[in-house]
């Protein structure tokens, strides 16, 4: 199975250690989403923009660990999207974004620009 990551799970980011057993397939950008800063990590929500990230091949154990990390408390929900590498899971932020900083570039790696 595959997963699209756009924030702290990306290569050389704060939570990238969760992806140690994953195989990077390549970069990907998804349209019709916007990226917001939640502080130390981002949240993607449906919107008028593009979010940039990476697609990985993962196993069931890694997906279960990521679900425990991302879906606790209802902060994110996993959604199936289409990528050039095949269908992939994506964590979509579930809370209101009012008052949060929009990352105009859609790229967490460029959040400070």
From Swiss-Prot:
CDD domains xref list: GGCT_like (cd06661)
Q: List where the protein spans the membrane.
A: none
* GO MF term list: gamma-glutamylaminecyclotransferase activity
Instruction: Give a GO cellular-component term.
Output: cytosol
Q: Name one Pfam family in it.
A: GGACT
Q: Which residues form a coiled coil?
A: none
By sequence similarity, the record places it as follows: Belongs to the gamma-glutamylcyclotransferase family.
Q: What does this protein do?
A: May play a role in antibiotic biosynthesis.
What is the name of this protein?
Gamma-glutamylcyclotransferase family protein YtfP
**Origin organism of this chain?**
Escherichia coli (strain K12)
